[in-house]
Regions:
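Glycine-rich phosphate-binding loops of nucleotide-dependent enzymes
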Residues: 1-231
Length: 231
């Protein structure tokens, strides 16, 4: 479904990704792991057309090269950045409305689905998004991305700064998305959560892929964890 082959990325003259290759299959959660500065977020931005790239990025067999971010989104890839990127002066419900593809109703997700999945958002649907807690904002960012009816969600650090109970909820909801056939590229620092919910793990370091395997294989590889993941 999503395939990166020897992908390079640049910020101006800075060469930050060096031949990244990875795949995300239909209905799969792939955890993209690594320390800060390893290239994980840049990989997400490269997929979404937000940075200059060389190499191959394809989605469902079609090249993403030269496409604008909104064109990539319209093809079925949603991106939830680390800063969540919600509209703080709009209400929860208005944020969800803006997530709809071209203003059209999602074929897969309804407002009721969102409020059933996250009951707290139903209670806060007329509240400005800027006054929500961090956990509520993360729920809103995820739900807004779903309203565009994506097939793949790239989500960057969804558990950053959240209470343990909310972290568990986010993990449960990502698994629920997988159960409904969505693919997830999960950029995550919390190794325990990543190993618990992913089917494959990709570890990055210095802008390159340094490990790819199953969660069990990563658990068994103490050298990789020590070299590339431990703080």
């Amino acid at each position: 479904m999503l395939r990166l082959d020897k992908l390079h990325a640049f910020y101006g003259k800075s060469h930050v990704l060096h031949g990244v290759s990875l795949q995300v299959a239909p209905g799969e959660i792939v955890a993209l792991l690594g320390r800060n500065g390893s290239g994980r977020s840049t990989t997400a931005k490269a997929v979404m057309g937000l940075v200059e790239t060389q190499g191959e990025a394809t989605w469902k067999g079609r090249s993403l090269a030269g496409l604008k971010p909104y064109e990539i989104a319209h093809r079925g890839i949603a991106y939830v950045p680390e800063n969540r990127d919600i509209f703080p002066r709009l209400t929860v419900h208005q944020n969800l409305q803006l997530g709809q593809k071209g203003g059209a109703r999602s074929a897969r997700w309804s407002f009721e689905d969102m409020y059933t999945m996250f009951p707290r958002l139903r209670e806060r649907q007329h509240t400005e998004a800027g006054v929500l807690s961090g956990g509520e904002q993360q729920m809103l960012a995820l739900c807004r991305s779903l309203m565009g009816d994506p097939e793949l969600i790239i989500i960057d650090e969804p558990t950053e700064g959240l209470a343990p109970k909310i972290v568990e909820l986010v993990a449960e909801y990502l698994l629920a998305l997988k159960a409904r056939g969505l693919s997830v590229l999960l950029i995550e620092q919390k190794l325990t959560i990543a190993l618990e919910i992913s089917q494959r793990c990709v570890v990055m370091g210095h802008g390159q892929v340094v490990f790819e395997g199953t969660p069990d294989e990563l658990r068994a590889d103490a050298a990789v964890r020590k070299e590339w993941l431990e703080v």
